[in-house]
A protein has these predicted regions:
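Glycine-rich phosphate/diphosphate-binding loops and the adjacent beta-loop-alpha structural elements
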Residues: 127
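Short "lid" loop at the C-terminus of a central beta-strand within the Rossmann-like core
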Residues: 124
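N-terminal catalytic or cofactor-binding beta/alpha core of small enzyme domains
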Residues: 1-121, 130-142, 147-167
Length: 167
């Protein structure tokens, strides 16, 4: 749970057994490996196979949220960062949600939806397997820099990384 309003929640989701669909998990592990230092914003890191309604409370407490995911369109390895706002986009009875729907849940259930972006990396291969394609693997440092730049824009630079894992 994110208890600090001056921290940024990073949620990486995807299937770690579907090649490039796992790129978000690798971005999260790269962020987790960073040693605390001056200028590093406070991050709460979380990975999941899908976005679920139970995440709404945690989102409502963060200064901002970066959703990290793979995507099928675009040039493989291309990193895209787009603002996202609360809104429809998922079946309310579905087991997984879009970032927009999850933000809407946070707003409606807990009175607050944080600023949020979706950082996506275009994949090349989505078959069965655990290895990333080389072009997607090379995009990980760029994606990490985008996450850190966005977090600094939202909260400044309090040092530290806190990790949380799905229950």
């Amino acid at each position: 749970m994110v208890d600090c309003p001056d921290s940024v929640l990073v949620i990486a989701w995807g299937n770690p057994l579907r090649e490039d669909d796992a790129v978000a998990w690798h971005v999260l592990e790269g962020l987790r490996s960073l040693k605390p230092r001056p200028g590093l914003p406070a991050l709460h890191l979380r990975h999941a196979h899908q976005l679920t309604p139970e995440m709404a409370e945690c989102l409502s407490r963060a200064a901002g949220v970066v959703f990290v995911d793979a995507r099928r369109d675009g040039t493989p390895g291309e990193v895209r960062c787009e603002d996202v706002a609360p809104g429809a986009g998922s079946n309310p009875l579905a087991h997984s949600l879009s970032p927009q729907a999850l933000l809407l849940y946070a707003e409606q259930l807990y009175g607050r939806a944080p600023k949020a972006v979706v950082l996506s990396i275009a994949g090349e291969r989505f078959g069965m397997g655990e290895a990333l394609s080389p072009v997607v693997r090379r995009a990980i440092p760029t994606a990490m820099r985008v996450v850190l730049r966005q977090a600094k824009a939202w909260v400044g630079t309090p040092a530290g990384t806190t990790t949380t894992r799905p229950a």
